[in-house]
């Protein structure tokens, strides 16, 4: 029996460090990053969904939204055939993803695959996601896209260097992070019940002492956190050929 692939997008962030949208009387208004417009006219979230929902292997999608999110109703993907439902995001990313997993309990089998992808990574390449699927299809747990660290890394206290970290075995985690449904559900349930604070799914898997596979990806798969990232994403998307 083949395994299905489901997508969870945690998009419940309400960070407002970037606010470039204007209202109908030309006032600047604060807006969550995932709803900022790219140069191609799409919001960051819609560009992200455009790439992922176009992948044939992905059967369905759950999106975790902020409690008072009114902007997703304007999304061109609001009624997409692959959108199973939206759920309310939690206080932290892990809670949002866990809520998404609970919404899949009547659909997904334990050995089906769950891809979790940041809503503000709109430059991910479909070919690299498919490569992730192919590399992990026989793995019992899962893994994630990542890039090798190339810069020299310093450990410091109060801006004073303590030591230089050996970068030869260091990787920078990206998304999607892809794990078996049953494993990821157990991992997130465990870290939440134990009061742990984690920032990605791979950390929850590590907490269960399970192993994740790193699959090399492009540095263009950036996470947009500031205006400089937004400019860089616009540049990368002009180079996007897929």
Curated annotation (Swiss-Prot):
Site label Transition state stabilizer, positions: 17, 33
Alphabetical list of InterPro entries matching this protein: IspD (IPR001228), IspD/TarI (IPR034683), IspD/TarI_cytidylyltransf_bact (IPR050088), ISPD_synthase_CS (IPR018294), Nucleotide-diphossugar_trans (IPR029044)
Gene3D superfamilies reported in the protein's UniProt record: Spore Coat Polysaccharide Biosynthesis Protein SpsA, Chain A
Domain of life: Bacteria
Keywords: Isoprene biosynthesis, Nucleotidyltransferase, Transferase
One of the record's GO molecular function terms: 2-C-methyl-D-erythritol 4-phosphate cytidylyltransferase activity
GO process terms (BP): isopentenyl diphosphate biosynthetic process, methylerythritol 4-phosphate pathway
Catalysis performed (reactions): 2-C-methyl-D-erythritol 4-phosphate + CTP + H(+) = 4-CDP-2-C-methyl-D-erythritol + diphosphate
UniProt pathway: Isoprenoid biosynthesis; isopentenyl diphosphate biosynthesis via DXP pathway; isopentenyl diphosphate from 1-deoxy-D-xylulose 5-phosphate: step 2/6
EC numbers for this chain: 2.7.7.60
Site (Positions MEP for the nucleophilic attack): 167, 223
Family, per entry: Belongs to the IspD/TarI cytidylyltransferase family. IspD subfamily.
Main function: Catalyzes the formation of 4-diphosphocytidyl-2-C-methyl-D-erythritol from CTP and 2-C-methyl-D-erythritol 4-phosphate (MEP).
Protein name: 2-C-methyl-D-erythritol 4-phosphate cytidylyltransferase
Gene source species: Vesicomyosocius okutanii subsp. Calyptogena okutanii (strain HA)
Taxonomic lineage from the root: Bacteria, Pseudomonadati, Pseudomonadota, Gammaproteobacteria, Candidatus Pseudothioglobaceae
Encoding gene per record: ispD
């Amino acid at each position: 029996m083949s395994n299905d692939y489901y997508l969870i997008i945690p998009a419940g962030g309400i960070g407002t460090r970037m606010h470039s949208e204007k209202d109908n009387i030309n006032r600047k208004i604060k807006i969550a990053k995932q709803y900022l417009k790219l140069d191609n006219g799409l919001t960051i979230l819609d560009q992200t969904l455009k790439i992922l929902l176009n992948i044939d292997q992905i059967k369905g999608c759950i999106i975790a939204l902020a409690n008072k999110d009114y902007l997703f109703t304007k999304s061109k993907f609001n009624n997409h055939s692959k959108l199973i439902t939206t759920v309310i995001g939690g206080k932290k990313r892990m809670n949002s993803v866990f809520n998404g997993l609970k919404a899949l309990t009547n659909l997904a089998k334990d050995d089906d695959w769950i891809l979790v992808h940041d809503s503000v990574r709109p430059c991910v390449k479909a070919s690299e996601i498919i490569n992730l699927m192919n590399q992990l299809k026989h793995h019992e747990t899962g893994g994630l896209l990542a890039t090798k660290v190339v810069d020299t890394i310093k450990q410091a206290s109060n801006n004073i260097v303590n030591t230089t970290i050996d970068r030869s075995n260091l990787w920078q985690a990206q998304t999607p992070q892809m794990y078996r449904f049953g494993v990821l559900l157990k991992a997130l349930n465990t870290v939440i019940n134990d009061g742990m604070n984690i920032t990605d799914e791979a950390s929850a898997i590590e907490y269960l002492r399970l192993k994740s596979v790193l699959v090399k990806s492009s540095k263009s798969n950036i996470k947009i956190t500031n205006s400089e990232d937004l400019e860089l994403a616009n540049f990368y998307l002009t180079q996007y050929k897929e």
